[in-house]
């Protein structure tokens, strides 16, 4: 699951337009940012907000004199508040991050019309990235999954130049596939100095990776069947791998 703290940080700081009832305003003063209202069960009015690294819900009693901050459960034991927070805060922010990855500089591995899309941030010197690349072969080669790799240079001092060599090649996507297939032994024309163009690509990818809350590679992102952004950092186990590749 994607780190919630990060997605909350992506939300725009928009001032709530309505005048808040006194009990809600008192809670707001504790550092909560009110985002929107919603209709709550039992004749109560709900307020959706964020506090530090958490989404929060506040419930105003029908008389308007009391407010309760916390989770609301129904008779089945279902957390109604958490469902709302996921839908209204985390899911939209996750889709925004997905769009940012779509618009980034990635290398295609697989068929461009493969139904399952998986983004992976990878460093040329990352051994787990190479293992993940090998793990993904059955799904990629069968046309079920397309990997979209965003190269970064974070593991070794030589990482940026090596990544730049791949990006500067005639066919970067093909070169990356050959490089991973060779276990990193493919001979590259590594530049003494990384060009401004290639450095910008690497810097942009690293910034995006950081914004997503990942600090190791491979950092893997995919959408769940509920259309929410999911994260797997490091080499996934078999169960997680199946989920990533669409074998829900």
UniProtKB/Swiss-Prot annotation:
Result for mutant: residue 126 to A: Complete loss of redox activity
Keyword Signal: yes
Annotated GO CC locations: outer membrane-bounded periplasmic space
Reported effect, residue 126 to S: No loss of chaperone activity
Residues of the signal peptide: 1-17
Alphabetical keyword list: Chaperone, Disulfide bond, Periplasm, Redox-active center, Signal
Disulfide bonds: 126-129
Localization per record: Periplasm
Name this polypeptide is given: Thiol:disulfide interchange protein DsbG
Gene responsible for this protein: dsbG
């Amino acid at each position: 699951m994607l780190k919630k703290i990060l997605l909350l940080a992506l939300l725009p700081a928009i001032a709530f337009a309505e005048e808040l009832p006194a009990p809600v305003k008192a809670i707001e003063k504790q550092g909560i940012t009110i985002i929107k209202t919603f209709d709550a069960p039992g004749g109560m009015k709900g307020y959706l907000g964020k506090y530090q690294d958490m989404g929060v819900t506040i419930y105003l009693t029908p008389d308007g004199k009391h407010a309760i901050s916390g989770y609301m459960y129904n008779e089945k034991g279902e957390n109604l508040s958490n469902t709302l927070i996921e839908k209204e805060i985390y899911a939209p922010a996750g889709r925004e991050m997905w769009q940012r990855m779509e618009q980034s500089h990635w290398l295609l591995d697989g068929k461009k019309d493969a139904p399952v899309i998986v983004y992976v941030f990878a460093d040329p010197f990352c051994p787990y990235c190479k293992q993940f690349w090998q793990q993904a072969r059955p799904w990629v080669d069968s046309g079920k999954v397309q990997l979209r790799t965003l190269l970064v240079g974070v593991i070794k001092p030589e990482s940026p130049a090596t990544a730049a060599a791949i990006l500067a090649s005639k066919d970067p996507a093909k070169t990356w596939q050959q490089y991973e297939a060779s276990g990193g032994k493919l001979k590259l024309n590594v530049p003494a100095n990384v060009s401004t163009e290639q450095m910008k690509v690497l810097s942009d990818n690293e910034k995006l990776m950081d914004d997503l809350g990942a600090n190791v590679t491979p950092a893997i992102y995919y959408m769940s069947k509920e259309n929410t952004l999911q994260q797997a950092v490091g080499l996934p186990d078999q169960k997680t791998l199946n989920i990533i590749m669409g074998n829900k």
